[in-house]
Amino acid sequence: MTIIVILVIIPVLNAQKSEDKTIKLKIVPVRHYIFSKTDRDAHFWSAIYIASNNKVYVGTSTHASAASVYEFDIATSTMRHLANLTVLLDELGKGIWTNGKIHVKMQELDGYVYFSSFCEDNGPPAIDAGSYNGAYWFRINMETGKVEPLARVSSLWGTTGQAMDKNRRIIYGLDEIGHLRRYFIDENYTEDLGRVDDWDVCRTIFTDEAGNVYGSYPPGLIWKYDPEKERIFNLEFLRLPITIDSRSMANPMLDRRAQWRIIEWDPVDKVAYGIIGGSNLLFKFDVNKGPEGEIIPLAQMCAPAYRGGNPFDVPHATLAMTINQKDRKIYYIPVTRGDFDYDLVSTEIGITGKKAVPSQANRPSSYSFLVTYDLKTGVREDVGILVPTDGSYARGMEGAATDKDGKVWFVGSFEQSDEALKINGGFRSALGLGCYDPFSK
């Protein structure tokens, strides 16, 4: 693997706002794969899973119409479109709200990969909300690729977080309005366990080895569902190491900086590792230590120019974190500039009070930067800027997973290098699948 050292100018808005910080960053070659030359898959959050059959499963989203499911065969480098959810659910062309988003981490059980959906800004805006058929649980047959809808999550609210208790054969879903739902796989029905948060729910929940379910909510708080007691508890004495609390009085706040953004259970250490939404701080959550557990801060994983500076300048954490069991390192992909989700949010307010949202072609570029944390030594390493071998750039990632050989796969926004994609409404970026091999020489 060839590594090139370049100079990258990264604006850092700290006390000396007039100065730029020049940092030497390495360019790290990665592979870039296109999902489709015909579909317009626009967005992605969390939904990447590498199954035991050595295939990558990805759920994409839109803010207009349909969510899609793809399968990528690592052995043959073949991409296959498995399903359009609006076609699968017979929603397309009916003038109703549609299942246009997949926001959850997927799980595998008995030859199937499970996920769930929801609707946000999908379908005609001025319609009767009662026409919506609801959000669903789904499973993918790993042998055939068939995607099958199962029971409904609810008649209206879908999921933004998902975790599985394989022993009890239950899937947990955190819905848009903060209710925790559980799906009984064998019985094929859903149960509402009650509200754990408001609309500003965290994107990821996790289960520990005992089947307890955990989630976070602002400001730096944690809830726990105990399946033995069948109760939801707020952990009273445990706090996340947050540095920023929201000042917004909006409801919902749409902030999420004061909770974890991404978290993953590690079966080796029997702890969870997560990233704080605002500071990009990596932390360890030992659920078995003490009456409620213990939180240990480890390292700030944002791009190097922001470390130790103004905490309000740190770009929002991404969902692109994975634990690599081959080298026992955490791989995380923050962005070099911008804010929430692919640098598509503008925080500039004009004289009229309206948000100024420049065209994508005129925005300053953001880049994906790879950072690792060695769980054996506690050493953080700045690997470098991810640059696909096709000459494009990786702009912002929102999900990552590791295969059995230790290669790191990720999904997000890539600069469009394919001529067939450059007609995409003037947008310079599109969804893609990327791969980084840390063991390639």
Model regions and ranges:
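Residue-level signature of beta-propeller blades and closely related beta-rich strand-turn architectures
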Residues: T62-H63, C119-D121, E176-I177, P218-P219, ...
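Beta-strand-rich domains and repeat architectures in extracellular enzymes and scaffolds
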Residues: Y33-A67
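Surface-exposed loop and turn segments in beta-propeller and other repeat-based domains
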Residues: H32-K37, A83-T98, A151-W157, D197-D198, ...
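Short, conserved, GDST-rich strand-edge loop motifs in beta-rich repeat architectures
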Residues: F115-Y132, I333-S365, S413-A430
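Blade-level signature of beta-propeller repeat domains, shared across WD40, Kelch, NHL, RCC1
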Residues: E398-K441
